[in-house]
Amino acid sequence: MSNISVIGTGSYVPNDIITNDFLSTIVDTSDEWIRTRTGILERRISKEENTIYMATESAKEAIKNANIDANDLDLIIVATLTPDNFMPSTACSVQKEIGAINALCFDISAACSGFIYGLEIACSMLKNSFRNKALIIGAENLSKIVDWEDRNTCVLFGDGAGAAILSKTKEEGILEFHSGSNGLKGEHLTCGVLKANNTSNKNDRLEKNNFIKMNGKEIFRFAVGAMNETICNIQEKTKWDLNEVKYIISHQANSRIIEYTAKKLNTEKDKFYMNLDKYGNTSAASIPIALDEMNKRGLLNKQDKIILVGFGGGLTFGGAAIVWSI
């Protein structure tokens, strides 16, 4: 059976920057309060860009980086909790924009774990079918579902998209996964839909319930536990010592979560790649944006061992062990 490798990456973030100082003018907060509790200095916010546009731009970059044609793609999976439409799917819209006429396309919703879930689904589909190449995208427009009057959430989130191309290969590549869900604790991180009554009565109003709501303490506790469990499980499956692992690329939610996880694993914080100071929490986009940034910066070399790990709403979690092949 063929192995599956990452052969290209891409990303897109909006140009508009919202700083901590700006947020201090609209809610009761400060740059010092946000920095010390989250590690975030600024985040990117879309104005004209929607989820489809950002996903498409990241896809174009990944295709170019992989040195393939869009027609080579057999599968497109988009992980997002902020689609522009219920239908067509974001993946089908990306297919149209890039001309990937041969690809099977669908979206998944697993919040901040979405990119990891997408990788696992794609690997399974490639290994067990005639399909050879897949495009996995994490894309989010979180600024549209943030309550800008809630200082506990509006300081955390940003917009962006990241993508990776997977291909069958004879080389080592994506080796192992560990993933799971805990719906029993789903109420700790929620975002409702816009409720409609399907009535012609002009006096009926839509109830706006589509803001992110979060129990920060419970999510922090879950995140540290899920990260630790996932990394340890992947170590057990691969027999990797953490000293062999060049980087751990985690979901970029909060620097304190990463620091606590590093302590529990008895490893240095610098092993965890972080860029949340620039982008904040971009949910499903955070891991692929970081992966592309590292690829562009030349931080990853062929045969480097890396671990991806995510956690998020659902509640969900997941991780992957990868031998880098670019």
Swiss-Prot record:
PANTHER family given in the database record: 3-OXOACYL-[ACYL-CARRIER-PROTEIN] SYNTHASE 3 (PTHR34069), BETA-KETOACYL-[ACYL-CARRIER-PROTEIN] SYNTHASE III (PTHR34069:SF2)
Broad class of the protein's primary localization: cytoplasm
Active site per database record: C112, H251, N281
InterPro entries per the UniProt record, alphabetical: ACP_syn_III_C, ACP_syn_III_N, FabH, Thiolase-like
Functional description taken from the UniProt entry: Catalyzes the condensation reaction of fatty acid synthesis by the addition to an acyl acceptor of two carbons from malonyl-ACP. Catalyzes the first condensation reaction which initiates fatty acid synthesis and may therefore play a role in governing the total rate of fatty acid production. Possesses both acetoacetyl-ACP synthase and acetyl transacylase activities. Its substrate specificity determines the biosynthesis of branched-chain and/or straight-chain of fatty acids.
Subunit: Homodimer.
Example GO BP: fatty acid biosynthetic process
Keyword Transferase included in the entry's annotation: yes
E.C. number(s) listed in UniProt: 2.3.1.180
GO cellular component: a single term: cytoplasm
Residue segments, region ACP-binding: 252-256
Domain of life, per lineage: Bacteria
Keywords from the named record: Acyltransferase, Cytoplasm, Fatty acid biosynthesis, Fatty acid metabolism, Lipid biosynthesis, Lipid metabolism, Multifunctional enzyme, Transferase
Localization annotation: Cytoplasm
Name of the protein this chain belongs to: Beta-ketoacyl-[acyl-carrier-protein] synthase III
CDD domains recorded: KAS_III
Catalysed reactions listed for this entry: malonyl-[ACP] + acetyl-CoA + H(+) = 3-oxobutanoyl-[ACP] + CO2 + CoA
Domain notes: The last Arg residue of the ACP-binding site is essential for the weak association between ACP/AcpP and FabH.
Keyword Acyltransferase appears in the UniProt entry: yes
